[in-house]
Structure formats: C-alpha cells, structure tokens
C-alpha cells in the first residue's frame, strides 16, 4: 500500500511539473511570436552635429547641410524604419563607426535611430545603405554632403 501511495504522489508531481512547464512555455511563446519582422521601408539622415555647425536637423530629401560643419567632432544620426542588415556606412569613402542606437516604437519595434562618429572629417559625403532582412529584400541608400 505504501508503494501505491508513493507511485501516486510521484505521478501527481510529474503531472504538476508538466502542467507548469506547459503553462510557462505557452506564456513565453505568446511573447516571442509577434509575427515576422517589418521590411526595411525608409532610410534617412535626420541630424548632423559638429563643434563648428552645432546640431542641424536635416529635412527629408536634402542633398546637403545648410550649415558649415567641422571641428573636433562630427556625428551623423540616421533613421531606419523596418529591419535592415549588412550596413554600408562611409564618410568620404572611409568606414564610420556606430556609437549608439535608440529604438523607435516598443512592442513591436518599428525602427531605430543610429548615431555615427565621423570625427576627423571636416566636410564631405556621408553614405548609408542597408538591405531588408526579409521580403522584398530591398536595398535602400541615402547620402548627404556635409559642408
């Protein structure tokens, strides 16, 4: 009889653990399955910041800055809507390093602001390119001449 009680308790414990695991698993699955990532839909330079020119907000479709930039630092902020990969980021043909990013949106994430460090350059062409991580796998480019 003691053996039967022990087996019953062991079976009940196993079923309880299975139920808890299933419940936790379902809770996690609903958080993780938000659907496919949004394709890359836009890529823009939104701000240029330098010692000489200060912070300049860039209007969409601008081909150059209106202020003369330069000095000890030069930072460029880009806005990416959707999910991109394989970044190509250059200033006057030289690679530029990302120094930070900020999420746009929350749940779901809809894009990012990226800050790039082009310090050492006084003026020239900033180029930025990314490819969507999913269909339609489009590649988007933007560039601006920094005075």
Please identify what each model-predicted range represents:
Residues 113-125:
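Surface-exposed, short loops/turns at beta-strand junctions within beta-sandwich domains
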Residues 32-69:
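Short, compositionally biased P/S/T/A/G/V-rich stretches that sit at domain boundaries
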Residues 4-15:
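Bacterial N-terminal signal peptides that target proteins for export
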Residues 21-31:
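C-terminal segment of classical bacterial N-terminal signal peptides
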Residues 103-116:
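Aromatic sugar-binding surface patches on proteins
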Residues 68-83:
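Aromatic/hydrophobic beta-strand junction motif of beta-rich domains
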Residues 135-147:
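Edge beta-strands of extracellular beta-sandwich domains
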């Amino acid at each position: 009889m003691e053996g039967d009680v022990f087996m019953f308790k062991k079976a009940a414990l196993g079923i309880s653990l299975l139920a808890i695991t299933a419940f936790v698993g379902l809770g996690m699955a609903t958080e993780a399955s938000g659907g496919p990532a949004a394709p890359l839909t836009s890529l823009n330079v939104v701000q240029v910041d330098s010692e000489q020119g200060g912070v300049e907000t860039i209007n969409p479709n601008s081909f150059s800055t209106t202020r003369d930039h330069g000095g000890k630092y030069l930072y460029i902020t880009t806005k990416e809507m959707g999910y991109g990969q394989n970044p190509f980021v250059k200033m006057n043909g030289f690679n530029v390093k990302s120094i930070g990013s900020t999420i746009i949106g929350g749940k779901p994430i809809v894009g990012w602001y990226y800050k790039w460090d082009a310090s050492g350059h006084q003026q020239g062409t900033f180029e930025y390119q990314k490819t969507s991580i999913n269909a339609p796998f489009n590649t988007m480019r933007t560039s601006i001449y920094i005075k």
